Amino acid sequence: MIPKSFRSAGPLATARRILFAGMSLLCVVPAFSQKVHDAIRPLPAGAVRLDGFFENDIRNSIDHWNKGVVPYAAMVDFFRNGRSQFALGEMWGKAVRSGCMFYRYTADPELKEILSQTVKDLLSTVRPNGSISCVPPEKQPDGPGGDLWERKYVLLGLDRYYDLVEADPAVLRAMTDQADCIIEQVGEPPKVPITSLGWSPNHIESSTLLEPFMRLYNRTGEKRYLDFARYIVSTGGSEGYDIFRQAYDNVPPHEMGGPYPKAYEMMSMFEGAVEYYRVTGDEYVRRSFMNLYDNIRRNEITIVGNGGGDQPYHPAVMGEGWDHTAVEQTNPDITRMMETCVGVTWMKFCSQILRLTGDPSAVDEIEKYIYNGLLGAMKPSGDGFSYVNLFNGEKVTNYGWGTTFGSLPVTCCNLNGPMGLAYIPFVAVMESDRGPVV
């Protein structure tokens, strides 16, 4: 772990010394009925410039991953022709989401063209009921296949494109059609309950739709999207376990959700909970996500800023579940731990807490992961990230969920790692009512 004194001299310190003449020119996204305002806000696109190894790693990833080997067309074909295994439809949204965040930083015209072409390709796959899905309407919603999880990432990818690259009305229409189709299919009986849909034992992954529905509500002001978000919260977020209540009651993360305390999906759902709180001011939800943040920070995060493991509590979750990892991190029986998806989502969840509250502990957690876990998981060639990250095991591994495109292995972590890099300039320098925040 890099000492604090060394870290303060790195690329983030360079960003701290930058003055931004255009800080007041913030891009404003409509926020209807907003009850809670953030203590800290991001700067406009292009306002931050890094140097040193952060800049090198970001450019390396853009050149060799987002503009390099990512098989965008093949990922779109999952929506056109179907998928061979569950959840493969997540890949397109993840690849596009990180590309859009990189574009926010670089304004790279070549990257913009790549993103524009693949978005156009995706929109050509819209099904007659308005969905962009890997399965035909008569098989929707496909629970075991991860249909809602896939459609969530379609929404997030399109949302980032619309917000950061091009505000194309066709993209907004695709998002509203996608969301409206979900509302028609999922909900209280006679619709299909959201907590009955998914591949996992408790189906928590489907409730991560909370975030894109809140984003779409903030963009459109359409009450039906807020109503659907409220429905998700009312279900507790998983089958058989009220994750919001467990977080509110300070249940340890590795005991939440029964046999499946899946770290990545749990934090992804609570990212949506923060967005929900901003609009509703629901203090029950706020206490839930603040308790979860504090309990993860104290009980799950290792010396390199990531968490989760397979031993001793949840070997069936393959190292991707909470494991009381802060204590168990040196357990010699661990064979899989610290999934890159977990670390990047922890970083994003921390950025939500930072913006909402201004709590400096969130910065400490973000820095710890960036300097250690994130950069340590990146392939030197820039074309991917390690799946799991043992302290004393293989440096880079692709063993886990994913598929192969020709000779290229693509995993969820290959796709999430670049998002972590793209968040570095996003969080490095922001602003508050009192001025720059570094």
Residues covered by each model-derived region:
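Bacterial N-terminal signal peptides that target proteins for export
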Residues: 2-19
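Bacterial N-terminal signal peptides
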Residues: 17-28
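Sec/Tat signal peptide C-region and signal peptidase I cleavage site
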Residues: 29-33
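Glycan-recognition and catalytic cores of secretory/periplasmic carbohydrate-active enzymes
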Residues: 34-438
